[in-house]
Amino acid sequence: MKWIKLYEEFESLSQEMIDLTNKLKKYDIPVELWGTGKSKTIKHLLDELNGDECYLEESESKITRYIEFVGVKIYYTDENDVRWALKEDRQEFNDGRTRRRNMPSSVSEKMKFGEDPLVGAIRGIKEELGIDIKGHQLTKRRDLHYNGGSLSYPGLDTKYKGHQYNCQIEREQFDPNGYIEIQKDKKTFFNWVKI
């Protein structure tokens, strides 16, 4: 049985995924840790690359992932003047793993190459929460740049360029029960917190 299972797994690997795995291993990236704990899989990285959400740059000694993203803090003020902030509570993966992140933004979305940050913020809110936001509801906070690792891809150096916004939603956009983003591999849960 093990041999059949092994064959089935390799049969589904594309040449593109094999090439990416070999490229990462060339730089001693511990891809065997990916897809466990809080990390994503090589297939997730391949999907990001093919979706123009990131790119990889090789040098003699290392490989670096570059991403540009928008982060949006979402607020609601109710009829009693109580202010609420939306927070990501958790992600539940189809394989049974749960990941909790202390995200500085309510919604974070990787931008497509050449995408305007405001358009990326509106798209991200629609994709993650199902809310149609108008541009006037968003105010720019700041841009930021930083380097570091990634919980999603352990061992892979990543350089980030971010655009931060605040968003004030209206009563008809507010769901007191929060929101659930459903993707093919996971669900992400968002809850309101009184501030």
For the regions a language model picked out, list residue spans one by one.
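Short linear clamp-binding motif
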Residues: 3-7
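N-terminal leader/linker segments that precede catalytic domains of diphosphate-processing enzymes
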Residues: 8-195
